UniProtKB/Swiss-Prot annotation:
Its cofactor is FMN; NADPH; Mg(2+). Homooctamer. Dimer of tetramers. FMN binds at residues 65-67, 95, 124, 186, 211, 216, 262-264, 283-284. Gene3D superfamilies: Aldolase class I. The gene is fni. Mg(2+) binds at residue 155. The keyword Magnesium applies. Signal peptide: none annotated. Pfam families: FMN_dh (PF01070). It comes from Staphylococcus aureus (strain bovine RF122 / ET3-1). The keyword NADP applies. This is Isopentenyl-diphosphate delta-isomerase. It catalyses: isopentenyl diphosphate = dimethylallyl diphosphate. GO terms for molecular function: FMN binding; isopentenyl-diphosphate delta-isomerase activity; magnesium ion binding; NADPH binding; oxidoreductase activity.
Amino acid sequence: MSDFQREQRKNEHVEIAMAQSDAMHSDFDKMRFVHHSIPSINVNDIDLTSQTPDLTMAYPVYINAMTGGSEWTKNINEKLAVVARETGLAMAVGSTHAALRNPRMAETFTIARKMNPEGMIFSNVGADVPVEKALEAVELLEAQALQIHVNSPQELVMPEGNREFVTWLDNIASIVSRVSVPVIIKEVGFGMSKELMHDLQQIGVKYVDVSGKGGTNFVDIENERRANKDMDYLSSWGQSTVESLLETTAYQSKISVFASGGLRTPLDAIKSLALGAKATGMSRPFLNQVENNGIAHTVAYVESFIEHMKSIMTMLDAKNIDDLTQKQIVFSPEILSWIEQRNLNIHRG
């Protein structure tokens, strides 16, 4: 594939993603908090700091991996980096393969660090990149963490995608052992299982982003790029973010879990934190805001989002993220069926 074709693919991904809409039905709507009428705290008591063994984020919300590798996506990364700088959010860039392959593309990613020199930035590579390239990806952005995206459904629907996956787990293990910053194993919208969590724990992984279905749909994106558009029947493949978080419960004391995939509102973010996530990521909401409404409007959107999270936590009488995990939740029969059939041991406070 030529550099021009790769740039074109990056732009196509963004165009199709922006045209997608949220899923009509979300598993976040299949779980409810139990309301208690009189909080014992005030809004100003709320501490939204997200603390993990290696990363401290001012807020448990981050701009998740999206793009880079073309002039248009450089402009997007520049604007998102300004939003991150002005709001204190962490930010992940999209796959840096283009920059690692062609130095001319490096600026489409490094613009994020240029615009946000003191901020927290996650670099991003695929599960098949050599260790040396993973190290380069971290150095390129002076990144505080490295996402490794695992995206086999996307690759298999992508006309020019990868068809070989046997080495992925061993390669991830090698990267984890060599890279000095936290390595986050990130799905891309298909969710995670307890079996995967077991395998990742065995190779020393300490961070995952479950990225469940319900948000940006890469099966749909790649199917749109197929000549016959003949794999649309896989559109609903995978676990939701709620199901994925429930799958991780037994591993949350050993692996820091981040949640993304289909988060629409501050309430969805709070529900994710209550299910054990340490932080929540969103992509398309930020992309649409910054492209359609500009930087200032997106900054205001983030500030409002954070304030709404504080209001919800006050209603729940939860001073911090840890308190949220002790709050009572009622699940729908469908979610309870998933828990039962998957033999998940879920204990609520």
